[in-house]
Amino acid sequence: MPDQKDRILHFKSPLGDKRCAISALSGYERLNALYSFDITLLTELDPIAPQELLGEDVTVTITVADVERKLHGVVCEFDEVDPVGDNVFEYRAVVVPRLWLLGLNSHNRLFEGKDAVEIVKQVVKDSCGLAIETSNLKSYRRREICCQFGETDLEFVLRLLAEEGIAFYFKHTKSDCKLVLSGGMSGFENCDPVTYPYNERDSSAWKHRVSRFKRAGRLCSGKLVSTDYSEYAPASPLKVEAKSKASKKLRPGELAFHGGHDFELKGDRNLPNGDCKEQAKRWQHGLEADGAQYTGDSGAPSFTAGHKYELEDIPVSSGGEKQFLLTEVTHSATEGYDQESYYGNSFRCVACSDSMTFTPAPPRERPRVWGPQTAKVVEVKNPEISGAHAEVKVQFPWDEEHNSCWSRVAQLYAGNEWGGFFVPDIDQEVLVEYINGDPDRPVVVGAVYNEKNKIPPYTKWQSGIRTRSGDYNELRFDDNPGSEEVYFEAGKDHNFLVKNDEAGEIVRDQTLKVGADQKVDVGSNIEYESGQKINVKAGTEIVMEAGMSITLKVG
């Protein structure tokens, strides 16, 4: 193969410098997205097996007029192409960031007491080891619980960043690639060099210049309405709005979001309206990110998505703006083995503004869990101590390391200090549903028996309720034909209160057995009437006492 030393495209890999060389490159990089580059490799005599490069870290160097641009990544695809000549083999390799590997992992798990940035760092570290830098980030709310369910690690990370309005891009240094999380315009780095001339008439492809620069625009939604609800402030459902400052003609339409907020625990758990308003603003900025842009062409390989540059000889189409943030760059290069070498790119950018935050578009869909799941109760909140709702923590079989957040328990009905109240106990198996399918908002809707927790010793005709304590209380119904029965048992005491009258009818016999004393305290009269006889028997004595008189009448 030709020596790579004096070429505009250089390929560094575990194969060494002389095994193969690049003949062409094309690819793109975007702000808030993963980059991807297709490279064409040529080798002589010694074919390359896919396993030699798949999963390997490689570096592509683009050199134009003594300015180098590094592209680091991992090979995710490798295809053999038809030979281009005698003993010359051609291959196609796709190079992506190591963050791409997160798309190969999928987990069902819970994160407790962490903010979005902490979660992202942990997932990236565990999955691919890509270095992360943060720039101009603020503090983010700690989430009581954050659930990853049915998502790849990559989908999960991108969702968290979008929910918090955190922009990201990749920074390629001489030795490696880093993921940069940015919280505002000052969090984006400059291109190197930072200043580029504008000249449409110069046909040289090797100058670091902008050869085309035009305005571009898109219609986008001009208003975002976000609603939500928290059981800790049921009388004040959340509704926040964010509007564009542009004209309604350019920003028609309105997008409605519901249930997209993760409320932070703050004392009484009131809704953090200020935080939600800021989140709505960030989401609106994300919707407007593509509204007013510029497109162009250049011969500068140092143009990198997520980086800023300054334009000299400002064209009329710039509207007087001088500094711009690159949001998308598409690269193209060919190596001059049998043709003239070439490098060029096309790009999209926005004018830099301190008031602008180029955030990701809000996630249109959170992951959904449709249908119930089983879980085991691991903690029960005592309402006598906390004054809280009927709440439990559960552990899911797909995450034995963490417990869920405090989850409400659905009742038959619930009012203000009235309604049903049954709370499952520790080690019970329960069924969990999710409000609007959101895995971060579980609700316990029932309990089921299993091999460990067996049903009460009832027959097929019997049903009822048996509670758990040192002993138990029970209300049982027996529907065996001819032997129907309602059975009540108190584990210790039985107390009841009738605030007016009590009436009843016993068609046949009544038997009452009292193991110790019986006392009846009546505020007025007692009347007994028997159709035949009344027997009174005492083991030792009978004492009858009247304040005035005793009357005994016979016949």
Residue ranges and their predicted role:
Residues 1-20, 208-210, 360-363, 370, ...:
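Polar/acidic, low-complexity leader/linker segments enriched in S/T/G and N/D
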Residues 1-109, 163, 291, 297:
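Assembly/oligomerization scaffold segments
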Residues 26-38, 272-290, 398-411:
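Short, basic/aromatic beta-hairpin or loop at an interaction surface
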Residues 52-53, 302-303, 424-425:
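Short, well-ordered loop/turn sites that connect or cap secondary structure elements
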Residues 66-74, 317-327, 336, 437-447:
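Short, Lys/Arg- and Gly-enriched loop/turn segments at beta-strand edges
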Residues 80-95, 179, 332-349, 384-391, ...:
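Short, solvent-exposed secondary-structure boundary/capping segments
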Residues 84, 114-132, 138, 146-353:
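Extended, domain-scale alpha-helical bundle/helix-rich regions
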Residues 170, 181, 309, 340, ...:
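Structural signature for extended repeat/solenoid scaffolds and their inter-repeat hinge/linker regions
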